[in-house]
Structure formats: structure tokens, C-alpha cells
Amino acid sequence: MNFQRMIDAFDMFNSLNLAQGVTPYIHLEKRRPEGTDNLYGLLHAIKNRYQVKFSYEKYYESEVTKRTLNPYGLKEFRYRWYVLGKENGEGIVKTFALDRLKDLDVTQTKFAFPKDYNIEESFRHSFGIIGPNKPHPEEIILSFNAIQGKYIKSLALHHDQEILVN
């Protein structure tokens, strides 16, 4: 979460707190991301460079697997939280959805954070948690009718989005 989003959330919280009696007039989305109960433990592990162990269930596999991870950071995308890191012996950074992560154990085993890893940079060309499988992204041109175009202009699909024809 970047600093501006934190400030925006704080401003919204303060506005709602100060405006007494407005609850009947405001309807917020009721969904709460699953797995947020592990945020504190994961943040503690990331900050202190502790390995974590957990059980993980993929949606497309019925078997629950045991994982050991060197956690590098957290990412939020569309009300879902993910932990990023490398598993023991693996060479690539993987993402694990917190809503499918169970039995979190923050170990006392330390790991070295790679000096060349940058979370922001690793997701620069991605959409959510899905990154390109090529070194450079491809250019994609989308076309919308005038009404849908207004929505796309007001809430970009991607931070690199450009408007070619207005």
C-alpha cells in the first residue's frame, strides 16, 4: 500500500468519524478479506527476516501442502492479500494468497533478504499478482465506446495505461 492510499484511507476514516449520524446514508462493501488474521505474524516475520511455515491449499488442487518460506513482503490486490517470498531451495519468488494460508508458524530461523529484490519493481509490469513471463511487456490496445471510456479514464485498469484517442 503506498503512502497516498494510506493518507486517503485516513482522511476517509476521519471524515466518517466526525460526521455523526451519517451511518444510515453510507453503504460500504461488506466483504472483508480472508486471511488478514495472519498479517501481524507475517509482518513480524518480514521485518525480522524470520522464515515462516504454513499449510497451503490451491484452488485447483485438492491436496494441502506444507510450505517453508522466506517472506519478502505483502501485496494487496482487489481485497485479497498475498505474501511474497522464496521457498527453501527454490529460485523464484512466489505469491501465496493469505485466505488459503493456514497454521502459520513464525520460526526463529533467520534468512538473508536479497539486496537486489524490489517488490515495487517486480510488479511494475504486472496486473495484480500476475506478471509477464517475458522480459518486457507487450503493448496492448483496447477500445471502448464513449460511455465505457469514461469509466476507464476515471479508474485505470493499469498504472501504465495511456489514452490514445479521447
Language model feature labels by segment:
Residues 1-15, 69-72, 109-111, 116:
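Short, charged N-terminal helix-start/capping segments
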Residues 33-34, 58-67, 94, 121, ...:
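Short, solvent-exposed secondary-structure boundary motifs
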Residues 1-57:
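Bulky hydrophobic/aromatic content
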Residues 10, 42, 46, 59, ...:
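Generic hydrophobic, helix-prone segments enriched in Leu/Val/Ile
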Residues 24-25, 53, 73, 100-103, ...:
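Generic structural signal for residues positioned in beta-strands
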Residues 43-87:
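Loop-centered beta-sheet repeat module
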Residues 84-166:
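Surface-exposed, charged, gly/pro-rich loop-and-adjacent secondary-structure segments at domain edges
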Residues 37, 64-70, 91, 137, ...:
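Short beta-strand-initiation
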